[in-house]
Amino acid sequence: YPGHLPKIQFDGRGGIVISNNMNYIIVEGFEVEGPAQDINYEMAEADRDYKIEVAEDEDDSTNYNHSYFSGKGIWGGYGAHHNIIIRNNIVHDTCGSAIRFNDSDHILIENNIVYNSNWWTSSASSAIVLAESVAVSGDNTDDIKMIIRGNIVYNNWNRIRFYVTQLPDNSGNNNPNYGTANFQSIWDGQGIYVTRSDPEY
């Protein structure tokens, strides 16, 4: 209904997750709240330690899947999407990114309020992210297709040292400790982050 702001509270991989192969979608007028207020530094550091233990135990039957500490507010998973509009939402207290799209094209993110994201993840995420954008129809022209505008974004920062089980090939960092258990830096946590787009995009 006009003027209503339905609230979605989540503690898993995402508040609103757009499934693979879903395109031409508008997500508008929601409040999405993650579990960040229920987590503290000791819990998040213990989760990072557990992630390292599971990743380095050489036991293929164990894997890390604690999405509680990295869940995203509104995102497209890791599948490609195009022609998506995310507008007039309030997204907050997400442990991972508030709004994120990977491998996507023709994305509009506008007039959202985003705050208190990324506090408890060791995955080096940021509040609003467009990662590895691709031209889904091969239209590598001068058209502006990925638009982030009119958002209010604040108090989004990482508190936990970066660790990742496997770096992407295009990470662009030559530090041998980057993202390993020995890495002692807190990484990323920006308000808006556009990264690693397809070279021909």
Model-predicted regions and their roles:
Residues 5, 10-194, 199:
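Right-handed parallel beta-helix
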